[in-house]
A protein has these predicted regions:
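Amphipathic alpha-helical scaffolding segments comprising HEAT/armadillo-like alpha-solenoid repeats
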Residues: 3-10, 28-42, 61-73, 93-110, ...
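Alpha-helical solenoid scaffolds in large eukaryotic transport, assembly, and signaling factors
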Residues: 23-28, 55
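Eukaryotic acidic, Ser/Thr-rich intrinsically disordered low-complexity regions
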Residues: 145-186
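Alpha-solenoid HEAT/ARM repeat scaffold
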Residues: 6, 10, 50-51, 81-85, ...
Length: 186
């Protein structure tokens, strides 16, 4: 009986999660990449999709850029966050990312993703790419004026004003917006 890619990937994810941390790196080298790529896009369990994206980011990120890009359209926000991270993270890659393609994708996420958490992470990703593609700064400046979420507007404005690649957490941005609203009403 032949096992499907979804079964192979699911079994691998469960085995990886159950393994001691010191064994995971060795297990990661045996990653069934094709099966995990299929599962990252089509497994019915969102936890498996997220885990597959995590594994691809850490063990096969260079070969999985298209998978990350396609997973940006997942209906679940936390899966899109994982896909966004996999697309922009350079730490686990051996090859350089294609900045032009990545910035194009992240600008689209910032402009159109319905989830403010995902858009906040898009601001953070673009902030790290400002010096490598001018469109990143332009998109952040647009978000500072036009995003529907006040915390994203504030975060984007801070990045646009400072040019710093570091973005505070969404929780901190929400706190700053509430604090500013209280001080205006006082």
């Amino acid at each position: 009986m032949t096992r499907t890619d979804l079964e192979v990937a699911s079994d691998f994810v469960h085995g990886w999660v159950a393994s001691p941390k010191q064994r995971r790196a060795r297990l990661g080298r045996t990653l069934p990449v094709a099966a995990v790529q299929v599962a990252a896009l089509s497994h019915p369990d969102l936890a498996i999709r997220r885990s597959c994206l995590f594994l691809l980011d850490h063990y096969a990120s260079d070969a999985s850029s298209d998978i990350f890009r396609r997973a940006l359209r997942d209906p679940v926000a936390s899966v899109r966050e994982s896909a966004l991270h996999g697309l922009v993270c350079e730490r686990c890659r051996h090859e350089d990312i294609c900045v032009t393609e990545v910035v194009t994708d992240v600008i689209e996420i910032l402009a159109f993703d319905p989830n403010p958490e995902v858009r906040h992470k898009a601001v953070a990703a673009l902030a790290r790419l400002i010096g490598r593609d001018g469109r990143a700064g332009e998109a952040i400046a647009r978000a500072a004026h036009h995003d529907s979420d006040a915390a994203i507007r504030l975060t984007a404005q801070i990045v646009a004003d400072s040019g710093q690649p570091h973005v505070r957490s969404r929780k901190a941005a929400l706190r700053d917006v509430r604090r500013a609203a209280r001080s205006r009403s006082s």
